[in-house]
């Protein structure tokens, strides 16, 4: 019996040794994964691109009458804050902002819905490229902010999905299975 157990352990060890080792995650890979799953990769939740896909300007402007934001306002808010923090990350001068967060929602223009969708995709893509190009020192100093950006995006994407469900414009087949 001891011989069988020994041979089994030895065989499994050889098999494990013969396999290529899994690369351990890095700070960069973790941050990129968080950014991508809130942008265009469906993992634990629906990404932004899927959340806004196929919406008309009218659907994006719809409000529930209870003081909540529209999908367009939420998308506009996401574009603003992602761009604001990306600008800082790149070391560029930030856009003049008086600190009133309400204006990041209220500047939404129904006529510009398609442009807002494109801007959201673009800024999320730019974040991924910027993190990919950044060195470890920069990522270490920014990791908390970037992680919060991913969380912030996921929070508002969840709101977008909820609003779509309320208005009847959400296709459950696009959800996470």
Segments from the language model and where they lie:
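Amphipathic, well-packed alpha-helical segments that form the structural scaffold of globular domains
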Residues: 49, 53-57, 125-128, 132
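Short, contiguous alpha-helical
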Residues: 24, 36-45, 49-52, 59-101, ...
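Bacterial Sec-dependent N-terminal signal peptides
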Residues: 1-23
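Extreme N-terminal tail/first-helix region
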Residues: 19-37
